[in-house]
Amino acid sequence: MLAGEYAVLHGGEAWCLAVDRYAVVDDAPAAGGFTPPEAIAAWRLAVARGLLREAPAEGSARFDLTALSGGVGRKLGLGSSAAGCVAALGWAMERERPGSADARRDELARCAREGHREVQGGGSGVDVLTSALGGLVSVRFGDGLGGEAVVGRHRLPGALRWRVFWSGTSVRTSEMIAKVEALRAHSPQVHAARLAAIDAGTADFARALRADDAAAMVSAVRRLGGAMAALGEAA
């Protein structure tokens, strides 16, 4: 996530960039392996919506998420569960109808997001949409998180180069969201002010990107870092 964290949960815009680490899902060499519950939920929704004729049997797919854990089994914050859910649905669709995952990618993205959120019990699902669509994505939920996402696909300025660094500490998104929601409950004005600062930084980010101004984007990200730190300290 580049901009709009937490504010996206309350109608703000978020920007997210896919990375070149991949979840791999293929046929399991033997039945009975573990199937993530997010994949099971996505398959069930896909059947209801006509993306699949039938849901694969649990244990019929092999999941390899090692590229998203640095090979050390640690949670790096790269969206491994989101990528695994998307890859699982894409695998199931391709197994039934080759080419269908690409042909119906927008539907795949929405279905995977809803299946993932159903199991996770919250969050925006922006990471799922980004994993499915790739590249740089903007997302807003104008009608709440249960409604349709307004999604835009964009290009980074040619002069901009991104690198991803790990902090060295694993965190659970659900726990972070719970702390921010607790702030909203006991200090709603502080919560609103902190999210407004994130929204303002996100608007700066979007303007800079549309102007193809790499330096202004860096300034916006720096401002967003301060806004996120202030939210964390308040929560």
Describe each PLM feature range.
Residues 1-3, 8, 16, 24-57, ...:
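C-terminal nucleotide
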Residues 19, 76-101:
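DPxDG-like acidic metal-binding loop motif
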